[in-house]
Design a protein with these regions (language model features):
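ABC ATPase NBD Q-loop/coupling interface
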Residues: 63-83, 113-114
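Conserved structural motif at the start of ABC-family nucleotide-binding domains
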Residues: 8, 23-25
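Short coil-to-helix segment of the ABC ATPase nucleotide-binding domain corresponding to the Q-loop/switch region
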Residues: 98-107
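Helix-to-loop junction immediately C-terminal to a conserved catalytic motif
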Residues: 54
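Conserved ABC ATPase "signature" region
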Residues: 69-73, 109-129
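Short beta-strand immediately N-terminal to the Walker A/P-loop
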Residues: 36-37, 87
Length: 129
């Protein structure tokens, strides 16, 4: 299924673990299809920004939109599996209680793909490696 690319907008987003905040009223608009690099020293908010976009954290203020769809605002966020995005972690880890095939199938299961289709896709993917 072909997906339509949508803009990503962060409007006045703030996030803090403590003082000072990691992101303070941060605003960014990314046009569909653009490639963006996040550069900066350790602790400047790059990973926090990605966690907010992925739905692994929620902002203290502001809002995040994918196109017209609100995916996060102060204290609330659409769950990661409902955001239609993917993220590859720098230091990834497999779920230790799952087999490799179960780890590969996990995002498909979260998307509601049928068991037979998951098994077909997992088998196809693992045959490549």
């Amino acid at each position: 299924m072909m997906r339509t690319l949508t803009p990503i907008t962060l409007q006045e987003v703030s996030f803090a673990f403590a003082e000072p905040p990691i992101l303070d009223r941060f605003t960014l608009h990314i046009e569909p299809g653009r490639i963006v690099a996040l550069l900066g020293p350790s602790g400047c908010g790059k990973s926090t920004l990605l966690r907010l976009l992925a739905g692994l954290s929620v902002p203290a203020s502001g809002e995040i939109r994918f196109g017209d769809r609100l995916v996060a605002r102060a204290g609330w966020g659409l769950p990661p599996e409902q955001r239609d995005i993917g993220m590859v972690f720098q230091d990834y880890a497999l779920w230790p209680h799952m087999s490799v095939a179960q780890n590969v199938a996990f995002p498909l299961r979260m998307r509601g793909v049928s068991r037979s289709e998951r098994e077909r896709r997992v088998s196809e993917a693992l045959a490549r490696v």
